[in-house]
Structure formats: C-alpha cells, structure tokens
Amino acid sequence: MNRKTVFWFTNAVGPLILVSYWRGVQAFDDPSVYWGEVPTSMQSLIVPWMFVAAAGYLLMFHRFFFAWSEDEVASLHWPWSPEDGKGVQRLMLLYAAFLLCSLVWIDLTRMYIEGPSTVGMVAIVAVLWTAGAASVGFAVLVWPARERLNGAKVAIAGSVMLSIQCTWWDALYWVMNFGF
C-alpha cells in the first residue's frame, strides 16, 4: 500500500461524511434532537471546538500527505514497536477507523432516536469510542518521530485538537449526557 491510496481514501470518504451529516440534520424538523440532554450552555462550547478539531485534522493531513515523503510516512511506528516500514498501513488503519465510524455515527443516532434499542445504543457508543481512539492513535503513531521528522509536533498537536473533540466531547461527554 502506498500513501496515495490513503490520500484518495480520505478524500473519498471525507465528503461522504459531510453528506451524511447534512442528510442527518435534514431528517428531523428540529435537528437539536441530536444533542439529547446535553445542556445548551455546553453546546455553545462544543460547537466552536468542532472547528478547532477540523483545524487539527488539517494540520495532521498536511504533514501526512504534503510535508512528509512517502518514506517518512512509512517510517511511522508505534512507541512499543521498532520501525518496520509499515507506517502507511498503520496510517490507513487509523484513517479507516476514524472516517468510517464518523460516516455512520449520525445515521446510527437517527435510527436510535426513531426507535431506541440497546443494540443501537451500543453501536453508537462503539463507533464514537473507536473514532475517539483513532483520533488519539494519530498522535501515538507520530510520537516516536517527534524529534526526527520536521513538523511532527504539529501533527501531534493536530491530533490532540481532534482528540479533544472526538474522545472527550463525543465519546465521553456526549455519551454520558445524551440520555440513553
């Protein structure tokens, strides 16, 4: 697998996520139903953070696909394992987990709102936790290269920005406050 494959995957699935969100918001007369029991005061804090998270995503994206070479991305490895040239595969795994879970979240939530069930709740929590874990995973993957690759700390900062949204606000706070 090469980096171009990951690049095109992200560019194919990313717009589908935006379409799924647009479609999800259009599904209800009052789209605020997606907030569940999250207090309005917290919504006004979470929504701006979504833009911070998007900026963090773009910081990482720039490093992975424009700033670093194919070989530099291939050199990325987990902190607990040696470099083996499979950084692109690891990156694909993280992007697939993050993007595919992001793609199905709003539809799962819509189905849950229309007909609450334990299976629906578990599915929503699972995709949010998976997306949250993947958002942290980007920083974990880049961490061993933080002194070696130019701009690695920028990618780590981007992952942290994204992770605050996906792990804290979505997978933890929203899940605890939605009203399952």
Predicted segments — roles?
Residues 69-134:
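Membrane-proximal helix-loop-helix units in multi-pass membrane proteins
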Residues 55-72:
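Membrane-water interface of transmembrane alpha-helices
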Residues 14-28:
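Alpha-helical transmembrane segments of multi-pass membrane proteins
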Residues 1-14, 44, 86-91, 148-160:
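Alpha-helical transmembrane segments and their helix-start/interface "positive-inside/aromatic belt" motifs
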Residues 27-43, 109-121, 174-180:
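Membrane-interface interhelical loops and short amphipathic "cap" helices
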Residues 133-180:
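Terminal transmembrane helical module of multi-pass membrane proteins
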